[in-house]
Amino acid sequence: MKKEDVKYDCSFFRGHIPCAPNKDYDAQCDSCTYYEKNSLQIKHLNNSSSLLKEIYEICDFRDSKKSFEPINLSQNFTKILIIKLGAIGDVIRTTPLLEKFKSEYGLCHFSWITHSPEVVPVNEVDLVYKWDNSSVAKVTSSNYDIAINLDKDREACMLLSLIKAQKKFGFLWKDGHINVATKNAEHKLITGFFDHISKQNTKNYLQEIFEICHFDFNGEEYRININKNLSNFWSKKIGKLSNNKVVIGLNTGCGSRWKTRLWPKKYWISLINILQKKNYFCLLMGGADEDEMNRYYRDKTGATYLGTFGLEEFISISNNTDIIVTPVSMMMHIALALKKQLMLFHNIFNIHEFELYNRGVIIEPHSGCDCYFGNVCKREKSCMNDISVQDVLSNIVLLNKNLKNK
């Protein structure tokens, strides 16, 4: 399947995710019988003013009418702009590119625009912009050597088209729809359109984004901000609470969106009780969406629950665990960035997507999963019931051995 065969003018086309006929019937544009032509799906934006106006309308921005001076740097620096707006975990898992660009280009000046500036590593990125009208105006007023967009949202694609750069990688807006800056992004574009093609993918996410930037992935690590003072504070506190036992961070949820990834409550309770009998220190973790559930687990098991925290403090607490058990979530990316031993629950995604750097194990239902990228289970009984407590325990034992062999 080639990008030229995609029916961007179809009523069912959803921008960058699978359409209903593909989700339901594995329909594919070049042989689809559900195609309904709709010219309104195509939006030609052929100049800078139309692109900028569309971004502002999509994001409900107001034009400040303010002009900004471009960034002036020594010619010895390669000026690189990264557009990665997405979820916090997505931003974190883009950071390995920093190391690669520095190794290939030497002195680099990085700018990064995102919804989540708090996780962009400030000691490695020179200018961090929070996505708003002012930031869009600033980055579009500057000239870059390289600009990269790894998001498929319309506004991100339009921004890359608007940016002035000698080289562009990733996704942009061209011919009235999402498109690719170079052919290397086509694989990632097509797997996003069609579930049945995505299921056949054997590349992990880092291989994909490195390929988009015309690199090979060679194990470059995540980068993350750690507040050393906060981390030291929690080191002392958790050290006292745990009495120097192996600390297992149990991230029990995955936000409000993906309920299909949840492991059954009775399994969590059983796991915690057994771990505590085996002299592990269980630390319940999560965000506001998991607060009520974690209080329930605390009351049922006596496990430690410290409450909910801002992201900076949550990262500091996570930094003082030894092993982290979690579904696919932001916590997975934090654990990888902190180089923790990781046990990852997996069901609804492509298992090849995940790079654990030889520091973790992936556990999935032996019965498989019928809900590819789905947030509603298709079965009477969720496949997550088929991941046994004993399987999880066995993997934790393996991870504990890894700790001892470090």
Name each model-derived stretch:
Residues 1-406:
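Catalytic machinery of carbohydrate-active enzymes
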